[in-house]
Amino acid sequence: MNANNLLQAAIFIVVLIAAAVPVARYLTRVMDGSSAVVRVFGPLERALYRFAGIDPRTEMSWKQYALATVAFNALGVLFLYALLRVQGWLPGNPQGFGPMTVDGALNTAVSFVTNTNWQDYTPEQTVSYLAQMLGLTVQNFLSAATGIVVVLALIRGFARHTAQTIGNFWVDVTRVTLYVLVPMAAIIAALLMSQGVIQNTKAYQDVPTLQTTSYAAPRLDAQGNPVKDAKGNPVTVQTSVKAQTLAMGPVASQEAIKMLGTNGGGFFNGNSSHPYENPTPFSNFLEIFAILIIPAALCLVFGNTIGDRRQGVAVLAAMTVALAAAIGIETSAEQGGTPVLASLNVDLAASPLQAGGNMEGKETRFGIAQTGLFVVATTAASCGAVDAMHDSLTPVGGLVPMLLMQLGEVIFGGVGSGLYGMLVFALLAVFVAGLMIGRTPEYVGKKIESYEMKMVSIVVLLTPLLVLVGTSIAVLADAGRAGIANPGPHGFSEILYAFSSAANNNGSAFGGLSVNTPFYNWMTAIAMWFGRFGTIVPVLAIAGSLAAKKRIAATSGTLPTHGPLFVVLLLGTVLLVGALTYMPALALGPGVEHLMLFVGAH
């Protein structure tokens, strides 16, 4: 960890927290209808309600809200699945891509609807422009809106008392999309285009290369099978490449909401390491900022809405402390390189001529400082976009993003999902504190009783169950082990990372695992769907239960939930649950890998 790394991380955190304040103020006013923007575009909003047959004045119980949420997203899966299956017969397909397979289309549909954006295909070789714009980009907006409205419903549960409703799902989704996501994405898209991110609908361009490249390609027979000689070795033919095909597309418009909505699915296979998605250090900084700005602002929205800003600041402080620690560990691990290279007298020190450390799988235009920031931000949130190959991180460098996902992505987390996950841990923290002092636990004026704790237990235990059971099945099944490219502990880490990513709706991966198979398509689709909606439903149940409770006044025995003591208690609860749940699995994967480095060095 050098001065440059520290300075870049510090500047980023300061800019993020400073920007979160006005964004939170805007979000609060939009959702309560007091913003001037809502008044200006009110006729458009009301026209949408009339067209859809919705009465915006009618609010929903938590069960109605949950049913609307699940049904809306299930219809999104069906629409996107159908679009990917028939894209070959639709316009907007200059490359003539055919339909995706049944399991591939279903996996992709579930992935984008659940805000995971897990991609086991090469987008620029698989998905048409129409499917990208009408299918994937639309779901990038709607899945992000779903996460935000769920946390808004939970916040209303804390803010209201003796109420039977928590809002109107259709009104919430419309306002979040119309007044928050669309304008913010438009601004970010314009800034990205200024940096060189492309935005067009041209066919792919064939351009001559500056230098002819030659390589040995396998000779194929008439059926396309490799030809072998008498000894069974493949026959090769020398091939020269004088031209290159450059993929085009409407990238900037999708890139903006991909980052802002913590979606993460790339227009290209290289994701945000591709120069057409992320060409400059400034665009990289902007994309990291876009990932975390709404999650950070929502913490302050929580405080504003319940009438005690200190509560939101405390949650934001806990997240920021954890984020800073993760950035420090990640950057130090990558800047330190590996003992194996050090034992070979390779110079790993940073200097004006080199970044030093472990630069494998990283872009030289970003270096270790910005890469470390991106790795932590994308896995602390439920984004999953990458500007480097996570499979090439050091064992400790790979452990950090894996653990951030396994903690439930509550360190800022996805838009909405991060805050409602952290508030669930806050309920668990005050429950534990209540047990220690012998008092009924309270949080922001609401008693936390057995029903809330049952729902908290479901939220806390469901994703670890999906991760560990899914990993176990994949390790035991032949179809699961067949995808491992790197045997040993790293192969296990690849599978553990895949299910941690899917169940927690992140979408990033250790690329050495081949997952475009029916086995992994079905397994990860199940993990993604239940990881998303298996937690949303109990969160909405908590919201409904809290809204119906009376507000109680704080007394001398009430645990303060706005000071440093609560921040420490909250972080301790998050880390303890994660450590106890995943430590054995992490020891078998990244833990063993890290120890093997020192064995190799000697």
From Swiss-Prot:
Name of the protein in question = Potassium-transporting ATPase potassium-binding subunit
Q: How does it assemble?
A: The system is composed of three essential subunits: KdpA, KdpB and KdpC.
Identify the species of origin.
Answer: Burkholderia pseudomallei (strain K96243)
Alphabetically list the UniProt keywords: Cell inner membrane, Cell membrane, Ion transport, Membrane, Potassium, Potassium transport, Transmembrane, Transmembrane helix, Transport
Q: How does it sit in the membrane?
A: Multi-pass membrane protein
Can the keyword DNA-binding be found in this entry's annotation?
Answer: no
Task: Note the superkingdom of the native organism.
Answer: Bacteria
Q: A Pfam family this protein belongs to?
A: KdpA
Output the Gene Ontology cellular-component terms. Answer: plasma membrane
Localization per Swiss-Prot or TrEMBL: Cell inner membrane
